[in-house]
């Protein structure tokens, strides 16, 4: 006996239609995973600008762990690092269907969407690498002398 779905539950047909729609689209969007603060607004997800203060908080905890070397600072930095990684992975997974639905709604075919997302993945890899290099240089070379 099949039970009736509740008002806010998806039906089996809706789930099957969504799975068919997402067929051939990777589960993880690498561009969204690597740089959600840039990728998100470019794909209509403006809430992603909240990643910037999150990254600044993470940068400060990492710098505190490096400069203070106390157990608390190191543990806090490790926790922040793991949580930030989890948030990025979850966003990379959840953003893919939203982005593909948006692109489809704008009339973009699947092959064009996938091609564009590959370009985004490469571009965001370069941008994220640049961010890490610049932040590391700042924290190791510039920041220690700022308050001296």
Enumerate the predicted regions with their spans.
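Transmembrane helix recognition focused on a "late"/terminal membrane span
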Residues: 2-22, 56-148
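Membrane interfacial helix-start motif at the N-side
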Residues: 13-51
